[in-house]
Amino acid sequence: MFYWLYEQFAASGYVPILNLLKYQTFRTGLAIFTAQFVVVAMGSRFIRWMQAKQGKGQPIRAEGIERHVIEKAGTPTMGGVMILAGLLVGTLLWSDLSNPYVWAVVLVTAGYGLLGFTDDYAKVTRQTTAGVSGKIRLALEAFIAMAAVLIIIVFAQKPPENPELLTSVTFPIFKQYFVDLSWGYLLFGAFIIVGAANAVNFTDGLDGLATVPVMIAAAAYGLIAYLVGNYVFSNYLQLHFVPGVGEIAVFCGALIGSGLGFLWYNAPPAKIFMGDTGSLALGGAVGAVAVATRHEIVLAIIGGLFVAETLSVIIQVAWFKRTGRRIFLMAPIHHHFEKLGWSESTVVIRFWIVAIMLALVGLATLKLR
């Protein structure tokens, strides 16, 4: 919205300060502060309201960690509503709303947030850990993801040097190579977005565990978006130039700000859980940003923590079905370490460290070739 004001009045020279709004870095900073303020401001009242409405709070897995059943019982869920409020307000206020990349990632974030909310509502009202049918949810996730990818393919500005880049997969290190999937990119892009959403959903099992790694990934991809959306920087780093995608940095800033605001209430011991409302929305957002910037493969590195959590579940289920035995004491893998005797805070902080290191490795691939 404010970028529109800049476009309307900056040329007149009557309000010189509006010229600051042409800088994506300036608007990204404002998006961080705005989103954080919104979440912190609404947090206390929203949590009290959720406690009154939900009563027993989020159901805790009876077969899970014993102390969780005792310590976390009664904690309300759906805190993702707070995250979405800050994220969407920060994005809509400070980004260029004529940019199709912005609307694509907003569609995924809001759509997945709504799906997660429906899932959380079912769990709370039925007091069960099973929500909406997995197949139905997966189908809706795929539909929303393909709609977002279609927006990018149809409406985004085509790179002048490589117009086919909008439907292509690029590779880290091997920067000069890309594979044009044509309309098959709809399926590939949807796979990345759906996979990222559910990977973050698996990770969200301890206080603050998913929030910080998502912010780290958002910071990394915010930098990537700014670089590949700038012709000078992308040319220097020999990255594929993606015109217009730099605006995604503002969205990433709002994501970081909303995450910081939520962490104020989600730090151990959590006063509220983000629930599927938050984890699906945040994971989908990260996946959509990876698709928009054409750095989908790098997400496996930057989001390596989420990949590890997902693989631990897949391996555990597959091995148990085949042999009747478990490889991990409990999956996802963060619960395995709890079963080994690690405290919750130890698991969370060490996983944060891993997320930081993986993000740095992922960013390092921008320079390697």
Swiss-Prot record:
Membrane topology summary: Multi-pass membrane protein
Compartments reported by the entry: Cell inner membrane
Transmembrane segments: 30-50, 74-94, 97-117, 136-156, 177-197, 208-228, 244-264, 272-292, 297-317, 346-366
InterPro entries xref list: Glycosyl_transferase_4, PNAcMuramoyl-5peptid_Trfase, PNAcMuramoyl-5peptid_Trfase_CS
A Pfam family reported for this protein in Swiss-Prot or TrEMBL: Glycos_transf_4
GO cellular component: plasma membrane
Catalyzed chemical reaction(s): UDP-N-acetyl-alpha-D-muramoyl-L-alanyl-gamma-D-glutamyl-meso-2,6-diaminopimeloyl-D-alanyl-D-alanine + di-trans,octa-cis-undecaprenyl phosphate = di-trans,octa-cis-undecaprenyl diphospho-N-acetyl-alpha-D-muramoyl-L-alanyl-D-glutamyl-meso-2,6-diaminopimeloyl-D-alanyl-D-alanine + UMP
Pathway as given in its UniProt record: Cell wall biogenesis; peptidoglycan biosynthesis
E.C. number(s) listed in UniProt: 2.7.8.13
Family to which the UniProt record says this protein belongs: Belongs to the glycosyltransferase 4 family. MraY subfamily.
Function: Catalyzes the initial step of the lipid cycle reactions in the biosynthesis of the cell wall peptidoglycan: transfers peptidoglycan precursor phospho-MurNAc-pentapeptide from UDP-MurNAc-pentapeptide onto the lipid carrier undecaprenyl phosphate, yielding undecaprenyl-pyrophosphoryl-MurNAc-pentapeptide, known as lipid I.
PANTHER family according to UniProt: PHOSPHO-N-ACETYLMURAMOYL-PENTAPEPTIDE-TRANSFERASE, PHOSPHO-N-ACETYLMURAMOYL-PENTAPEPTIDE-TRANSFERASE HOMOLOG
Protein name (Swiss-Prot/TrEMBL): Phospho-N-acetylmuramoyl-pentapeptide-transferase
Organism of provenance: Phenylobacterium zucineum (strain HLK1)
Lineage of the species this protein comes from: Bacteria, Pseudomonadati, Pseudomonadota, Alphaproteobacteria, Caulobacterales
